[in-house]
Amino acid sequence: MNRNKENEILETTLAIAEKNYPEAYRFLLNAYEESPSSLGPQTFYFLACLADGPGTALEWLRKAIQENNWWYRPEVLEDDDLAALKNDAAFLSLKAISDDRYAAAASKSTALFSWKKKMADNLFLAIHGNTQNGDVARADWEPIVGTSGLWQLETVQSAEPDGYGTYRWSYDNISYLPVANSMESLQNEGYHKIACGGFSAGCDMLLRAVTFSPAACDLLILQSPWIPVLQDHSEDVVRAISQKNIKLRILCGAEDVDCLPKAEQLYAVAKQAGCNVALTVQENTRHQFPAQPYHV
């Protein structure tokens, strides 16, 4: 499956669903019917949530869990959009199967750091968002980093499963540690420049790493930043960025109603603290990378 293509389709689906659930369902169903193999667990979940009745919703979940052997984080199957299935015996059976698979995956999952050795003068470390993985991060950032050979692109993948094939970050004192440890391990490898880029929750992990550990970099790029760390630690964050002389670049879609306020808040406090910071608001863009990539 092509997770990047799927993410774009699902973002469009969300935009339509804000005004019309049936229309959003038809759009996503058409996308699925055009290319079933390119869409995965999230598409089936969205189709179940948008379905016009519990029978159709249950069938999508049956296809995902029973036929495709996928699974979801337990909380996901407790969504209000699936409330009509809450006491359905067939649904509860599927959920039990999914929950068991999640528990098995979580018990053996570990963080993955792709770096093996120095292969270029500069290094770019990409951090995925929730319901993503290291491969998605690499595909998202490759057009931005480029293929000139000037930058070596590496990734960190969370240890916490989100669903089948995807991972998530928690906003606590533990989840960010693989990011911090990876950043620290690179600092004495002889790179001319080290840049880090995060998408959504990945931005929060980078800010926590810079703030609560010795980790540092030359450039920090935050795309569509979902950054709860600002709620209690905004002063600590900008102090760390300033003291470590990190260039901060914040980019967010003009239509990203959840993340744009936080992006603007971070820009304001960083600017006030004297940080080298810039904010780019990307027109006609929601919670996603822009159609036309920018460059490091």
Region spans (language model):
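A conserved short beta-strand
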Residues: 215-228
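TPR/TPR-like alpha-solenoid helical repeat scaffolds
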Residues: 43-51, 71-97
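Short beta-strand immediately N-terminal to the catalytic nucleophile in serine-hydrolase-like folds
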Residues: 196-198, 223
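Alpha-helical segment of the N-proximal tetratricopeptide repeat
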Residues: 3-30, 34
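Serine-hydrolase catalytic machinery in alpha/beta-hydrolase-like enzymes
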Residues: 122-188
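Gly/Ala-rich beta-loop-alpha elbow adjacent to hydrolase catalytic centers
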Residues: 198-206
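The feature captures the conserved acid-bearing segment of alpha/beta-hydrolase catalytic domains
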Residues: 227-296
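Short beta-strand-to-loop junctions in surface cap/lid or active-site-entrance loops
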Residues: 108-121
